[in-house]
Amino acid sequence: MNPDQPITELFTQPNCQPCKQVERKLNEYGIPYIVHDISTDENARERVRALGYTQTPVVLASDGTSFSGLHLGKIRALRND
């Protein structure tokens, strides 16, 4: 991973099928990302709440925009972020 490349953040939790689908798409499109498990990371859980979300997956793009759920168009758009 290039340290100068913007990083997308993916907030997940165990047994979340949409989370796994989003992660597969990020990998498929070659989008660099880091994963935060909100079930074990209180800071990540608070960040998700602060963004206004109550469920996972939550994707936080490097430009500060975010979305929840499996939105293929939004995920594809991250390739150009």
Give the residues covered by each predicted segment.
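Non-catalytic, surface beta->alpha helical segment in thiol-disulfide oxidoreductase systems
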Residues: A61-D81
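ATP/adenylate-binding site constellation spanning eukaryotic-like Ser/Thr protein kinases
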Residues: Q13, Y53, L72
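Short active-site oxyanion
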Residues: I7-E9, P32-I34, G64-T65
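Short secondary-structure transition/capping segments
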Residues: P3-D4, E46-R49, S68-G69
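Structural micro-motif
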Residues: R49-V59
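Short amphipathic alpha-helix with an adjacent loop that forms part of the alpha/beta core around
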Residues: E46-L51, R76-N80
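Thiol-based oxidoreductase modules, predominantly thioredoxin-like and allied folds used
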Residues: I31-A44, Q55
